[in-house]
A protein has these predicted regions:
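ASCE RecA-like P-loop NTPase motor cores
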Residues: 1-321
């Protein structure tokens, strides 16, 4: 019985692999990638870049009405991105789409502040200098807040660099440094953070969403870099190819709205109840220096937004924690 089940399972895998290599590879709207762990292939994956036709044929045409609810449907305050990505443009043109943007029940103007540091090195042009400045800023923040700080990174390399610089500086401070991939898995790090009076948690994509730290558990959230996907990211690479073939601007069509939604999700980790209070800090100066920075500013649920210099970090953080 078990052998027969394994044979059927292998046949299923074989059929799917054949479909991917014989059919999906020919399509420009497909992303195909291998998941590799410790030098061994774990998964062969295929995913659609655009799901609008599938949603239309499999869902929209079979219902008379549909309600989509989420905290991250908008970029800035516009629904255009989600309407386009979900294949609803035709229905919008027919006047069949209604949108509603409800304000948060939280009083962000009283509960939180978004600090944007505008004199950091450019993370793309001066990555080494940026890492040093991030280390200095995190040390400053952790010592000011006395722990209860979570820093969100976008790059494993930078996370490792900053961790290596910061760990000896925090030695003897009483502040526990908890770093993804170094100090335990997600559950262990979250448990350590919750049960430590003074802790600085540094993590990657997993921590940008799905983390719920209410009350005094999180006083300061640090966004190290704006969460643009790396050009080497399979999805970003495939999107770039797709946009090029369809003569679309990759940055405006995909990269910017994708990053803005992830940014909103990350900032949303700070205030989780009506009693929370805290400060969010963006260490990527592109949020103030680049024209597209306004998209991120407008995507933040925090309306109190202050532009500061590096030397003002401690003073401003102290005001809100």
């Amino acid at each position: 019985g078990d052998i027969q089940a394994y044979i059927l399972q292998l046949k299923d895998f074989s059929d799917k692999a054949f479909t991917i290599f014989e059919e999906d590879l020919q399509r420009d709207d497909r992303l195909i990638w291998l998941s590799i762990s410790q030098g061994r292939v774990q998964e062969l994956c295929s995913s659609l870049l655009e799901i609008n036709n599938e949603l239309d044929n499999g869902l929209y045409q079979h219902v008379s009405s549909l309600i989509m609810v989420s905290a991250t449907l908008t970029v800035g305050e516009s629904f255009d991105h989600i309407i386009r990505r979900c294949g609803l443009s035709r229905y919008q043109q027919e006047g069949r789409i209604r949108t509603l943007l409800e304000r948060s029940p939280f009083h962000y103007e009283e509960q939180a502040c978004l600090l944007m540091v505008d004199d950091m090195a450019d993370p793309t042009r001066e990555p080494e200098q940026f890492s040093y400045q991030v280390t200095e800023a995190l040390l400053n923040i952790a010592e000011t807040v006395k722990g209860r700080v979570m820093a969100l990174f976008t790059s494993r390399k930078m996370l490792s660099e900053v961790s290596g610089l910061l760990r000896p500086l925090l030695k003897g401070s009483g502040i526990a440094l908890l770093v993804q991939n170094e100090d335990g898995d997600f559950a262990a790090l979250m448990d350590g953070f919750v049960n430590s009076e003074k802790a600085l948690l540094m993590g990657l994509e997993t921590y940008w969403e799905g983390v719920d730290l209410k009350g005094d558990l999180l006083k300061c959230l640090v966004v190290v870099k704006l969460p643009f996907r790396s050009p080497s990211d399979p999805y970003a690479s495939a999107a770039e190819k797709y946009c090029r073939l369809h003569r679309l601007n990759t940055f405006n069509y995909f990269m910017l709205p994708d990053a803005a939604v992830r940014f909103k999700q990350g900032i949303g980790r700070l205030i989780r109840s009506e009693d929370d209070r805290g400060v969010a800090i963006v260490l990527d100066s592109r949020i103030t220096r680049q024209p597209y920075g306004k998209v991120f500013q407008n995507s933040s649920p925090i309306s109190n937004q202050v532009i500061i210099s590096r030397k003002e970090i401690a003073q401003q953080v102290e005001r809100w924690t």
